[in-house]
Amino acid sequence: MEILKETFPKMTRLAYLWNPLAVSYSAGTTSGNPSYDEAKKITKTLGVQLLPYRVLSLAEIEKAFVDMPKVRPQALLVLQSPLMTLNSKRIVELALEKHLPGIYPSNQFAQQGGLIAYGPVIADLYRRAATYVDKILKGAEPANLPIEQPTKFELVINLNTAKQIGLTLPPNVLARADKVIK
């Protein structure tokens, strides 16, 4: 969200597309969704209104994009989930149809035309998974292996998309990018 705010400093409304089946729920949160609660806290600090769209299927994703113009979001944030990954191409198409700049959870979205992607380096996750498999094959008990979080993240910017929707990205945002698609 901070990248979006840096890219669009006048942004006041952010559409937030999420799938509740893919998030870990916590009894200690207001909504039961720690990711949503954190997003709400950050957007409030940034002076941005969070417009959540809870989706469980492609049909609900498409309906969310039909409904979005009613509240006029200035940007889109897509939360990582298998549903979003499976429908990444369609989500990007819908955002482009609405001229809605978005930040997406993985490089895959930027490769398909999404404006900005920020997320873990997928190849690194596979390498780390292989070390787990190796340990298990050598006799380690899976229950005794620590849970690891991603450590390598990448920022990918699609300049073709920026041009298509008529955006000029600030030089400081471009300078932070690990990869720029031209």
PLM regions and their residue ranges:
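Short hydrophobic alpha-helices and adjacent helix-cap/hinge residues
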Residues: M1-K182
